[in-house]
Structures are given as structure tokens and as C-alpha cells.
């Protein structure tokens, strides 16, 4: 049995809205206008053939009878005022226009000339349109408020039901002929609640299936009701007053009056271009703000409680530091001036007193310091003989002799503490005798003390004590080369440089890692698909089986080539 494929219907929900926006934008910018209308006094107006041909049978017949190769067509109306034709274009493109009451007859005659026929019109005569549409033309400068109960019969059908339902539609004005104006001095001027009538209102495409009703109903939002009733007698006597009339399409009540609209005649019912969808809401066709999204809706609301985010384990995200280009930052000239770390003798004494547990490794030092403090040792009894020194160090500490100095106090004297040491005359006289004795210290320890670093005990129990302190930040290190490497953080010195790029490093290990990772394609050589990769030196012709061998080769044989000072060689 043959299977039939199901038919799918694709619907574009915003199709009508997009068409209206495009046609409105084309009308405002007159692009691409392919129809030129020459009115009285040779005033030219630009429009589109598609819109006018769909609305006017006269224009459609002229375009069908005249076959022109040129894309632009000119139609002459020498007896038609350009102002009224401009109102007509606003009405056809946007579905509504704002005119004065005495211009309705002229506009209707123009509609009859273009064979645009309709049995039902809807007009709105409102007092508050005087304030909003007062600057339409120069002749409408002085306006008077009209009565709320003022009725005008214009020889057309009046629909009283639509008057009450469509009172909110009376505030919509044309974008090009309606500007915001201050309230008039006379009474009866209404203040519009929503600022819907702006200088640049959105125009929509004229729908040929819409019914144009003619009705004259007062608006429901008039503020000064008592003043309007008091001035109604004066306004009735002045029949020549210019009263603006809103001539708009019935967009909001189409669904409610569908039965009545089927019986009425439509504009351009015989045209082939009258198939535009009518499912467009009134807010999208009359309000500019309805065609765009509100920006405040896209703003996320702040969370009420931030503790849930902080306590959630999914939010512990570790973001790596941005890798800066090496060699172009932290130069010698950009370093901030550092102040040396000031040693405090009292803090050192408190640190020593906090370690109350006896340590066997410091027994000999405590014994010697105790004898020095009490005068038991002097320069005559001390000899350079090492056996005598060792025998002296093997004596047990006497419990009767108090220990005034900590075990680490001897090994934390620095050159910047000479002033504190000189303040102790009793201890300074005893220490002067130690300069003549040979304690058998290793030369490495003496060299470190000469450089201004701290010397610790040589026994294995004190190996974990950090001996070398940074003069800038006070950080301690157990090895002298670690302190030397750390000082480059403060000084900005980068003694190692890559010869293959501009990178500079503070440590040799960082440079070797850079060579093996960034420049891996340079040091890697391939002898074939079956053989393993070999690593060649970038400074000579030697090759190695592993990266570790290449690193040892670069660190040993080409150590001078890794230094920044030898870049010019």
C-alpha cells in the first residue's frame, strides 16, 4: 500500500507586521518609489504603484493601459491640491489620517476621482486633537475647542455602536502631519493619557478589505467636561471654525462586526491585490511602540538571595590568568620603588620565647651563650684547638644558669641590626672574643653571612629553618639561590631570553619549558612515518631521543646562549 506523505503548513506569525513595516519605511523614505504624482502648481509626490493600484481602480487601469519600459511612471493631476493628495497617501499607507473638518469633503471628492468607493466611513471630531494636531497646517494655528455633544451629519451612514467602542482610536494621528503641541488656552482641551501620537508615528500598509466608516463621536477621555458644555453655544454659532477630524480605518472592531462588514462594499473589491491578511492587532497597526520589543523586558531581575550562588559547588569556577606576552611587561623602568624590610628585634625575641620545648640540637649553643652572658668564658681560655671546642660543646646545660638569649638569636644578626646589637654593652664585649676563635664553620655559611643573609645551625635538626629573608617583602627561603630567584620578582630582572622569539624569563626552567612547548615544531624532526620523532638542538646539529636529553644539553652546553646579556653574540 502506497504511503502518502503528510502535508505540513508553515505559518509566519509576523508576516503582516513585517510587510507593514517595510511599506511604511518605504513611504517615509520615498524609496523605492516608482510612481510620481504631479499635482497643482507642479508639486511632485512620490508613491508606489503597488499600493495605489491596489486601492484605486483608476490608477490600476492607467498602469495596465500604459506599457512603459521605464520603471518610473508619472501621473498628472493638475487640478488637485497637493495637500489633499498628501492626506490621501497618508490614509492609504497608514490606514488613518488627521485632517480638519472642512477638508473632509475635498478628500472625499479626491477619493471619488480615484474611484475609491466605500459606503461607510468613520470620522472622529475631538477637542483634544486640537492640541495634538494643531500644527498640521499654517491655517490651523488658531483653534477653538469644540463641544462634546457636537454632531456633524456628512451625508453618510453613522454607526453609533462603533462610536463608543472605538473612542480609544481617536488619539492616533499621522506621523507626518501630527506633532505634539502644548494645550490650548481655551477650555475643553483634553489631555491625552498615553503619549501615542508622536512626531514619527509608524505607518502601516493600507488594507483594501477594511471598511471605512464615517462617524462623529466625542472622545471618552475629555478632562474639562464642564468648560466644554459652557462654551458649546459659542462654538455652534461659529460654523467656520477649523475642527480636526480623524479619518481612520476600522481596525479594532473587525471581528465584532464581521457580519455587517460582509454586507458592505469594500474598497477595491474588484482588484486582484485585495488578499492581504487582516489578522493584525490594533496596537501593532496604530502604535509605533507595539512594533518593537520593550528594552526593559530583556533586563534580568537581580537575584533576591546571593547566598545560594556562593554556596553552590557548580559556581566554583577557576578562571586562569590571562597569559601576557613575555618580554613586554615588568621592565626595570616600570618597577615601583620598594622599601627594605625592617627587622624588629623584639619580634624575633617573642618568636624565640614561643618555642618553649627544649631541642637537643641547640644544647651546645645554649651552653656557650650562657657562659658568655655570665662571664664564664673569656678570650684566654678559648684556643683554636678543635678538640677543646668539641669538649666544651659536649658539656650538659646547667639548670641553675638562666638562659637569657634564644637558640636562634646568634644566627639572626644582620648588618642592618648593628645598632640594636651595639645597645647591649655586656653582650657586645663577650662577642668580640669570638672573632679570634675558629669554630670550623663551612665556607659556604661564611659567604652567605657576608652577603647579608641569615646563617642557621649546621646540625640536621635545623635544616627545615628558613635562613634567607627577602629584604623587600620579608619572605624566607632555605636556599640562597631561591632567594636570588625570588628577588627578580621585585627587581623585574629577566636574565633568560629566547632567541627564537621575543620572550624573556626570570628562570631558566621557564625558558626551557617555553622552547619545548611553543617552539616544539622547530626542535622536532621526523625521519619518516614509521620512525619516532627526534629532538634537535636549535643552536647546533645534535639530535636527541627525548626531550629530557635536549633540556640537559641546552642547560649545559648552551647555557650562555640562554642569557639575555648574550643576545647580541
Curated annotation (Swiss-Prot):
GO molecular function: DNA binding; DNA-binding transcription factor activity; RNA polymerase II cis-regulatory region sequence-specific DNA binding; zinc ion binding
Comp. bias regions, Basic and acidic residues: 197-206, 251-263
Positions of the UniProt region annotated as Disordered: 179-276, 304-336, 438-462
Gene Ontology biological-process annotations: female analia development; female genitalia development; male analia development; male genitalia development; regulation of DNA-templated transcription; regulation of transcription by RNA polymerase II
A single GO cellular-component term on record: nucleus
Ranges where the BTB domain occurs: 33-101
Domain of life: Eukaryota
Span of zinc fingers (C2H2-type): 468-490, 496-519, 535-557
Pfam families in UniProt: BTB, zf-C2H2
Ranges of Polar residues composition bias in the record: 213-222
Assigned keywords, A-Z: Developmental protein, DNA-binding, Metal-binding, Nucleus, Repeat, Repressor, Transcription, Transcription regulation, Zinc, Zinc-finger
Cell compartment(s), UniProt: Nucleus
Family annotation (InterPro entries): BTB/POZ_dom, Dev/Hematopoietic_TF, SKP1/BTB/POZ_sf, Znf_C2H2_sf, Znf_C2H2_type
Disulfide-bonded cysteines: none
Matches recorded under SUPFAM superfamilies: beta-beta-alpha zinc fingers (SSF57667), POZ domain (SSF54695)
Main location: nucleus
Function: Transcription factor required for terminalia development. Negative regulator of the JAK/STAT pathway: represses JAK/STAT-dependent expression of ventral veins lacking (vvl) in the posterior spiracles.
Protein name: Transcription factor Ken
Native organism taxonomy: Eukaryota, Metazoa, Ecdysozoa, Arthropoda, Hexapoda
